[in-house]
Amino acid sequence: MTELEEGRLLRDCRWLCIQTEQCVSRRLAPMDITAVQAHILLFLLWHGEKGTLLTDIHRAFGYSMPTLSCMVKRLREKGYIRAEHCRGDDRRRLLFATETARLLQPELERSIGAVHRRLYDGFSPEELDTLDRLQQKLLRNLSPLMKETQKEESKS
């Protein structure tokens, strides 16, 4: 495979992610929630009563901390998230989904699931397993590269 074709593969991956996110956001627009906000809410809902730190969301999704702070602020303003200080460390806050968010959960899951089903339509279970395996391999290859660039950034 040529370098040009490798670049196309990455562009196509990016395009798939962007378009999928836009499709989900359009479905959720009547609820005034974006795809990213929906994924954050579902993450909080799935973590239930123990709460979640902003850094946990950062690790799970890879969004920058400032971006996440803005998203969490908007979701708090809409009444979907509440924050409590951590016991023993007032600087850290645990985030919880509210009952209002819990009521949205079925529709969030339905909207995201509908887009995913359309995206994977026509794939056999074996093809999906292969795709998953290859994506995991890409992520494993990316991990050391990310650590290298983070070290370089911290030096400057």
Report the location of each language-model feature.
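C-terminal regulatory/oligomerization modules of transcriptional regulators
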Residues: M1-E5, P125-S156
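N-terminal leader segment of winged-helix/HTH proteins
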Residues: M1-M31, K78
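Short, structured helix-loop boundary elements
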Residues: E6-L10, T34, L54, M65, ...
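Hydrophobic structural patches
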Residues: C13, L41-L44, Q135
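Alpha-helical linker/hinge and terminal dimerization helices associated
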Residues: L16, T20, F61, L104-Y120, ...
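N-terminal helix-turn-helix DNA-binding core of bacterial DNA-binding proteins
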Residues: Q22-S64
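Charged, amphipathic alpha-helical coiled-coil/dimerization segments
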Residues: K73-R133
